[in-house]
A protein has these predicted regions:
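An interfacial alpha-helical scaffold signature
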Residues: 1-272
Length: 272
């Protein structure tokens, strides 16, 4: 009979004194969750998985199959978020494996100080995501209208033919003006929001809408916020939207999330 090799699947690290025994199963829906407590103040949330599910040629195919990976990724997130309700967490990426409890213990022994420092840093804090959606056509029209209004007195003094060409010149320059406006607006908004945050990072801008819609993601930011600052941060998001929505820019706020974007590099990964 062929022996099925298993591995330890890691969800996150947390404060040992704040986490009891966990109920439920891991990402495979079969193996139970467990808590490994290598130090008095530090624990790892884990479960067993079949090694072949995550390593090897067939595993590479599974990782491209949304029907397979989707429910497991959602379960991963659900476990981390459940732990986060009771303790600060250092979340790890989906599919992080260790070959044995001993290998995980060695990893914690090497990086325990950094993990503990991170847990202390994010205590009573949460990650929030902010995305900026720009309706490029609406923004272009708003800037053109503002430019025409600002130069109305000068335009009114021109002969009709000259005025027409001058208005066309203003419209033609709208795209360049839009780029400059967007760059400056991004800078101002980031500075405005960062005043409430303990940390901030810019993330890759993932397209949301089709190019034909004229709506595009023009900023994708993550903020580490003290829980007490959340109401004021929401208020600042609303202020930005009140100021810029008519000009085509709207911010979307989502969270709270585990602080994935702020985890220090620890070279976490499968260990032979």
């Amino acid at each position: 009979m062929e022996t099925v090799q298993s591995a330890l699947y890691l969800f996150c690290f947390a404060r040992s004194n704040l986490i009891g025994e966990l109920e439920g199963t891991g990402v495979d829906g079969q193996h139970p969750l467990s808590v490994f407590r290598p130090f008095p103040n530090l624990c790892a949330v884990q479960s067993e998985v079949r090694l072949e599910d995550f390593c090897g040629a067939t595993a590479e195919l599974r990782m491209q199959d949304l029907a397979w990976i989707g429910p497991r990724a959602l379960r991963h997130e659900a476990v981390v978020e459940e732990v986060m309700r009771h303790s600060p967490v250092l979340p790890v990426r989906f599919g992080t494996l260790f070959s044995s409890q001993e290998r995980l213990a060695e990893f914690v022994d090497r990086h325990g100080a950094a993990i503990s420092q991170f847990l202390e840093r994010v205590a009573n804090q949460e990650e929030w995501s902010v995305r900026g959606l720009l309706d490029r056509r609406q923004a272009g029209r708003a800037l053109t209208s503002a430019s025409l209004a600002a130069q109305e007195a000068q335009l009114a003094a021109l002969l009709p033919g000259r005025r027409y060409f001058e208005e066309q010149r203003i419209r033609a320059g709208a795209e360049k003006e839009l780029s400059l406006w967007l760059e400056e607006t991004r800078r101002q908004v980031a500075n405005h929001l960062r005043q409430q945050a303990s940390d901030f990072c810019e993330c890759p801008e993932v397209p949301r809408e089709s190019p034909e819609s004229g709506i595009e993601v023009v900023l994708n930011w993550a903020f580490l916020l003290p829980k007490s600052a959340t109401p004021a941060f929401r208020a600042r998001i609303n202020q930005v939207n009140e100021k810029h929505a008519m000009g085509g820019l709207v911010l979307e706020l989502s969270g709270p999330w585990p602080p994935y974007r702020f985890v220090p590099p620890l070279s976490i990964g499968a260990t032979p």
